[in-house]
């Protein structure tokens, strides 16, 4: 059974298309109009081992908030849909990823219960047209729409680009492990029988 999803999200603020294949090869293509965010989405695809296509048109004449938020919601929805009933998955994943001086840790539980803990240092306000305060909101939006628990911590780092990118890579690697199929898991990986 293919673990894929195609999500279209249209609001008065944005028009989003996300296509996701959990069992891909890390091929990604993103065009949101926010170049640094596109770079981060590419990290999710590449290091998550997902094939990911994202096309967003948003109200960038205001700022990047709605574009980034709606894209993140659509990505989380695609992740939830592609997972289906979650039978046979590992469910949990964690990763610690360095990027030069930056070190980020992420842990995920595909529990069906959304909860996000995000700890990072104060960063310079902008990376190009990307507002660094959106990083937490991206992870919160993915968490809520995918219905997963996510913990992200920055353990060290000075360069804002490195700090944010290390977080996305860590989340990608944690998701890669959590969505992986495990032949030893029969059915739903929960004593409740549902996730």
Swiss-Prot record:
The keyword Amino-acid biosynthesis applies. It is found in: Cytoplasm. It catalyses: D-erythro-1-(imidazol-4-yl)glycerol 3-phosphate = 3-(imidazol-4-yl)-2-oxopropyl phosphate + H2O. Its EC number is 4.2.1.19. Its main location: cytoplasm. One of its GO terms (cellular component) is cytoplasm. Pfam families: IGPD. GO terms for biological process: L-histidine biosynthetic process. It comes from the Bacteria. The keyword ATP-binding does not apply. Keywords: Amino-acid biosynthesis, Cytoplasm, Histidine biosynthesis, Lyase. SUPFAM superfamilies: Ribosomal protein S5 domain 2-like. GO terms for molecular function: imidazoleglycerol-phosphate dehydratase activity. Belongs to the imidazoleglycerol-phosphate dehydratase family. This is Imidazoleglycerol-phosphate dehydratase. It comes from Frankia casuarinae (strain DSM 45818 / CECT 9043 / HFP020203 / CcI3).
């Amino acid at each position: 059974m293919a673990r894929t999803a195609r999500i279209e999200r249209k609001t008065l603020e944005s028009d989003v298309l996300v296509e996701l294949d959990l069992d891909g090869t890390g091929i990604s293509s993103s065009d949101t109009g926010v170049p640094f965010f596109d770079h981060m989405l590419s990290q999710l695809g590449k290091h998550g081992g997902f094939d990911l296509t994202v096309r967003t048109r948003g109200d960038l004449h205001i700022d990047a908030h709605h574009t980034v938020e709606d894209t993140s919601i659509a990505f989380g929805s695609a992740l939830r849909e592609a997972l289906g009933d979650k039978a046979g998955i590992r469910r949990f994943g964690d990763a610690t990823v360095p990027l030069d001086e930056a070190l980020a840790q992420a842990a995920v539980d595909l529990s069906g219960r959304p909860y996000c803990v995000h700890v990072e240092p104060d960063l310079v306000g902008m990376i190009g047209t990307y507002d660094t305060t959106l990083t937490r909101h991206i992870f919160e939006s993915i968490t809520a729409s995918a219905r997963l628990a996510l913990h992200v911590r920055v353990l060290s780092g000075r360069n804002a680009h490195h700090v944010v990118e290390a977080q996305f890579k860590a989340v990608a690697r944690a998701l890669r492990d959590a969505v992986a199929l495990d032949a030893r898991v029969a059915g739903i990986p929960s004593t409740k029988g549902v996730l």
